[in-house]
Amino acid sequence: IVAAHTAKVMVNDFLDTKKMAFPRFFFLSNDELLEILSEGKDPLRVQPFMKKCFEAVQKVEFTERVTMKTIVSVEGESVPLCKEIDPAETGAVEKWMLEFEDVMKASLLKVTRESVVSYTTKPREEWILDWPGQVVIAGSQVHWTKEVTDAIVAGGLKEYGEKSNVQLTNIVNMVRGELTKLERATMSALVTIDVHARDVVVQMSADGVHDPKDFKWLAQLRYFWEDDTLKCRMINAQAQYGFEYLGNSARLVI
């Protein structure tokens, strides 16, 4: 009995070291973690546990050389990794899982950067269809923040409210048209965001907001692309966007 207890304590201590090396292992039971560690040299057999560590990741696509190349969401959306990951080269499972986490975030950062830059190069309705749903929401909010700020300074909130109505109508018309399941999910989420954004602008116009430092504007969740990253601000609080992949799920709240 003593020997069995000692062995159990040693196993738990061993698993704790793995969890500390890759904290997302805390989402797994000890039995699941033991199974992952036993299969760690074969990433294809670890695949079923990816979703428990990364909620939006249904699976990862591999190359013929068994390097990780693409994230696939629960909804079937694909996002290419900015760098292929070779689990065999990295070694221990917690090390290549940690590398996957870093590369996932770097990939979302890269795609978001590209989307923000390309926003002004084509009609918004076309731009929306070029990017993953999460990136569309983030990129759109960056430009909304800038455009509303410019409208406040120029005294053009009323006109921007009218522009917001036109944009919203265009998106609703697209939702009613022929779209793929993923495109429709992106559009539906964007409608929720755009309705809220329109209402904010209309209310600020009615309240006579004319200063970007007005509390009514500062109290809104605003997105900024600064220092090559995405920052979110509200009143005097600021947080960096985490670039955790969220998939293309519905947005119930802003």
Task: Describe each region flagged by the PLM.
Residues 47, 51-253:
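Extended, charged/polar low-complexity intrinsically disordered regions
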Residues 4-57:
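Amphipathic alpha-helical packing elements
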Residues 40, 253-254:
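Conserved mid-sequence domains
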